[in-house]
């Protein structure tokens, strides 16, 4: 019984910690760009009350480093000012053509900028879009139009799974990094 109570307490505590982090939610537009769902801006600002920009930078650098297998290959930084993430998500979404699933991946750039008490996450930029069995597809916005992923500027309900895969890949990554920065128990392993 004590173990069950302890387990429930720890689960509740982890949800509380995650709840402290702001939910990051970028959505895909018909132009092939991502924007903040709340206000259609191309960035999200996360507040860190009472923290200096140097402290926030260090926390972000640790969180980003933990999120990748080989961080030195994808992270560029301007000390205490900016972190640039140049990554790849293979098979991030599936598109069905004549019932045949085609898996797509993407290369992307995400920039994090810092001020005292704040971190700005610029909307991810898709720098390369590719099928696992085909060469690069450019421009990404042209592919979205050609495949009717959007109709009249609105998501095509029949292709929503493609949009969800792209948005989910970025939002899950960024929310994981953000939650890691807010997690105060990471040192007690």
Residue ranges of model-derived segments:
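Bacterial Sec-dependent N-terminal signal peptides
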Residues: 1-24
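Ser/Thr-rich, low-complexity intrinsically disordered terminal regions
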Residues: 21-189
């Amino acid at each position: 019984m004590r173990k069950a109570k302890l387990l429930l307490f720890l689960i509740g505590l982890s949800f509380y910690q995650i709840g402290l982090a702001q939910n990051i939610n970028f959505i895909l537009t018909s132009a092939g760009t991502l924007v903040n769902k709340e206000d259609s801006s191309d960035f999200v600002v996360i507040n860190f009350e009472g923290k200096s920009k140097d402290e926030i930078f260090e926390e972000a650098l640790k969180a980003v480093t933990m999120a990748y297998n080989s961080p030195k290959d994808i992270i560029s930084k301007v000390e205490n000012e900016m972190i640039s993430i140049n990554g790849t998500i293979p098979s991030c979404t599936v598109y069905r053509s004549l019932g045949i699933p085609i898996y797509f991946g993407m290369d992307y750039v995400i920039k994090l900028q810092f001020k005292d008490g704040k971190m700005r996450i610029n909307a991810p930029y898709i720098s390369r879009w590719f099928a696992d069995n085909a060469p690069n597809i450019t421009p990404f916005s042209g592919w979205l139009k050609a495949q009717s992923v959007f109709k009249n500027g609105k998501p095509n309900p029949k292709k929503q799974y493609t949009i969800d895969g792209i948005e989910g890949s970025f939002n899950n990554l960024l929310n994981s990094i953000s939650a890691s920065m807010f997690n105060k128990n990471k040192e007690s392993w």
